[in-house]
Amino acid sequence: RHEVVAQVGEQLIPVPFNLNTLHMVFEKDKAEELEKKLTDTYGYGSKVPIMELRKSEDAGIREIADYVYQNIFLYYTMKQWGQKPEEISEKVTGRVPVLISRDNGYFTDRYQGVPKQGFHRMFRNLLDHPNITIVLDTDAKEILKFQEDEILLHGEPFQGEVIYTGAVDELFDCCDGRLPYRSLDFAFEHYDRDSYQGRSVVNYTVSEDFTRITEFKYLTKQKDTDGTTIVKEYPFAYTGKDGEIPYYAILNEENRKLYEKYRKRTEHYKNFYLLGRLAEYQYYNIDAMT
């Protein structure tokens, strides 16, 4: 099962924050008192969003919430999103709730894993079909045109279904304004030693300019590797320049209204469907799209 820790000072603590984390960061008697408050209030096994926890009228629960907010959410969120937790959708901050349990797993899915031969091979196999034609290095706007009452594909009226998964604002040349996204710069480093950090992912929630370090051999379970490779992730604001990738939609009310302008430009075409992170301006995990 996938587990993630956060580097907070000299400690590596499990995230999402759970009862194990609670006992690591508070002294024994205090931790036991706070654990009882959490289980009595929310029930063992519950998942409580940090912004909900901060609204509690109980001083002890607010003390936990303040610790989690300051040491796990605040700086990490500002790095990742360029905004404070209060400024983005609670759908985003709620993705990493406080767990009222002793489960250190980052995900709760019964089955977890990666494709045996990697995602590259998996998608090659998916696309290797006689009914699938792949066209590379082609802007959708070059082959897809919107007329008043129909869609043209390669200059001809097209009555079939069109499923669009790209950035919807760029499909319309950002005519209503560019939808804000966060992008990432991946800095790869290789070391001639068996291990760099002894685990797959370490989040840096109170320090560093990067958000996390991933050490791949702990995800792939490779044993016969020559050294170890890591990657550091540096978030930045997407501008649309060549080479930048719009990874994360910045979900708030203002951006949602802008997205709706673009969505309404497509709703007249009954055979046109928006699907995925970019086209729907949403934050999906890969399992939600299968």
Feature map (PLM): residue ranges:
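A short alpha-helix-loop-beta-strand transition element characteristic
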Residues: 1-9
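Active-site/ligand-binding neighborhood in enzyme catalytic cores
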Residues: 4, 21-160
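A residue-level signal for conserved active-site and pocket-lining positions in enzyme catalytic cores
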Residues: 77, 126, 163, 213, ...
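Conserved beta-strand termini and adjacent loop/short-helix elements that scaffold enzyme active sites
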Residues: 135-139, 216, 275
